[in-house]
Amino acid sequence: MLDKMKQFKWLIIVSFILLVIPLYLTFKNSQESSTLKTAFEKQDRVEVLHYLMASEKYASQIRKAGYIIPSDGAIRLDGVIYPLEIEGDVHLKISPPQKDAKDFQLFFVTQVNDKQTYVAFVLDKDLNLIYSNYSQDNDSGKREGASISQSEEDRLLKIVRGEIDGFMENMYRILYA
């Protein structure tokens, strides 16, 4: 009789654990999804990029939207989606922002004054330019810093903002429409 009581207690404990774990995982997943939707609605692009790129969770939806990301195996190996590529007027490569970051980095190559120019931007959540860097290959093939006019920088920033805003709209539509 004592053995049956002990087995019954273990059965209750195991059943409880098997019930609680899926409920906890469902709650956590729901909470994360809610946080992402809130970030979209606040237009906090840094937070949205962090949640989308922090793991392979949204990889299939990003691919479905037509964006280029590494294979699932590479994402699992790196722990993040790096890079997220947006092909448009310029081919953006976005680095994943850290949790609670205030900015994010992106890179692309474009033509400035008939020379191939490598561009790095650091943008905040409102897509304001925090930092920019430009480089070009010199005649001997070494990359060196370059400068561009303010109007050219403004033109490039406008293109980048349009591409990122388009990405945000597409992802919101795919995830929540």
Predicted regions mapped to residue ranges:
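Extracytoplasmic electrostatic interaction patches
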Residues: 85-177
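N-terminal export/targeting and maturation segments
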Residues: 24-98
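Hydrophobic membrane-insertion alpha-helices, especially the h-region
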Residues: 9-25
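Short, Lys/Arg-rich N-terminal segment immediately upstream of the first membrane anchor
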Residues: 1-7
